Amino acid sequence: MRRGILLGLMILAVPLQAQSRQSVWDGAYTEEQASRGQSLFQQSCARCHGANLAGTFETPPLMGRFIPYWAGTTMDVLFDYVSTAMPLDRPGSLGPTANAAITAFLLKANGFPAGTKEFASTSEAQKNISFDAVRPIPKKKSAKAR
């Protein structure tokens, strides 16, 4: 009996979790944060990834092919990677605020819109932001809702 109740509660919780999920298309950073991130990127990342984010023979581009690589994940996955593996010559040295700003710049450079709230500098806060390669189609309002 308890298992049935627990299973029922878990099934009911899934739609609630999906409804609370935000997309990068909802504006996961601010313009000002992306601007700070661009400066930090030029100082700490451009020598490997290029000033135009095109990458080199040895490093991947951070535009174009970058999007499908991260698509289907949540933003904490990208943020954790940037925070722990970059810059290559001194991984994890930039700190959470700088890494959040650089991630915001990467989103802007890839055409994702800015919002009114800064991209969080903790992984936990980013677990509900999905990295959708394509803008989700808005749900149509039903005739009754009008």
What spans do the regions from the language model cover?
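Extracytoplasmic electron-transfer domains, predominantly the class I c-type cytochrome c fold
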Residues: T56-F57, P61-A114
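Hydrophobic h-region of N-terminal signal peptides that target proteins for export
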Residues: L9-A18
